Curated annotation (Swiss-Prot):
Subunit comment: Interacts with PFN1. Homodimer and heterodimer with PFN1.
Annotated protein name in UniProt: Myb-related transcription factor, partner of profilin
InterPro entries linked: Myb-related_repressor, Myb_DNA-bind_5, SANT/Myb
Biased composition (Pro residues): 137-149, 219-252, 305-329, 366-377
Residue ranges with Basic residues bias: 381-399
Compositional bias (Low complexity): 127-136
Gene: MYPOP
Function of the protein: Transcriptional repressor; DNA-binding protein that specifically recognizes the core sequence 5'-YAAC[GT]G-3'. Dimerization with PFN1 reduces its DNA-binding capacity.
Region (Disordered) residue spans: 87-108, 127-261, 297-332, 358-399
Amino acid sequence: MASAAAGEAEETTRLRKPRFSFEENQILIREVRAHYPQLYGAQSRRVSVAERRRVWDGIAAKINGITSWKRTGQEVQKRWNDFKRRTKEKLARVPHSTQGAGPAAEDAFSAEEETIFAILGPGVAAPGAGAGAEEPPAAPSSQPPPPSACPQRYVLSEDRREDRRADTSAHSKAGSSSPEPWARPSCTPQEGGCPRPKERESPPPSALQPVQLPRLALSPPPPAPPLPPPPPLAQVAPSPPSPPPPPRPPPTLSASDPSLDFLRAQQETANAIRELAGTLRQGLAKLSEALSALLPLLPGTPVDSLPPPLPPPPPPPPPPRPVLPPPAPKVEITPEPVSVVAAVVDGAVVAARGVIIAPRSEEGAPRPPPAPLPPHDSPPHKRRKGFPTRKRRGRWKSP
């Protein structure tokens, strides 16, 4: 039972890989420094995700060359992100730890952290940097890092100092050929202080050749185009001389302004149109005079040059109004009910109710009304025995 538990514990411990050793950290920092432009620098925007993953896999392959276990590119990238995050957090705590009392040895920076500072550049030296954020490299600056963080970077042990010397001597060539100007090894402890970082090396400025721009002088206004001479007209009859065209205003010398040029062109166009209208008017007058002189010379034409105008035609008479026949008297004929008994007495129709209806005469002359009948003792409405006694419904009216 105990052996089984020991086997499970051993199997469990095998699942976790050992921590990164000092040599692995040095290889990781060196390779990231060499490929920093592709991973986080100016070229990272043009590098695809697959290419960036291949770069991390190459770094992991170099680390696996000195170890017996194998690390993947994701593990190597995570180790670098942890390195960077912890370094930024420690740098953010430095100004606060130096203001109060207490030992500052707990915030001492290691050789790896110093190298990470050199890789990330002076942009991460500001306090309050975000933890774990993937920030692009900051622009090179000539300002020195905070003075409070400078003395504490060198609270290192003797073995760290030796490793630091070996690391700086090994990577001096890599630092000289680094693509970024600020990616070079930091100051050494033998210098006795943190010197100011060297400013960005730039090539000596070439002799600036002054470029003289030619002064543009104002061009004079364009001269007005000469007016074309009017076409010659054959004079058939003498005509009075035409009035001379109005004199043109003298051109005023002013600065070359596009608005003035436009107004001047408009004025010239208006003058040309006015002169053309006068020329056409004169030509029409001469043509009418020539026609009036030629019409009497034609055979079969009266002496008068022009016939008198015809009188306007008289307006048409209004249409006759239709004659309407005289209105006939309206005669309303009311149908008598079936139950009314009528009798003919002396040619007159006498209803049972005592109403006398005069018959129509053939000649159209009305007859005199007959004498009224004597009153009857029997009631006027007498129901015959042959009529049915049922009730009438619908549109029939009862008598």
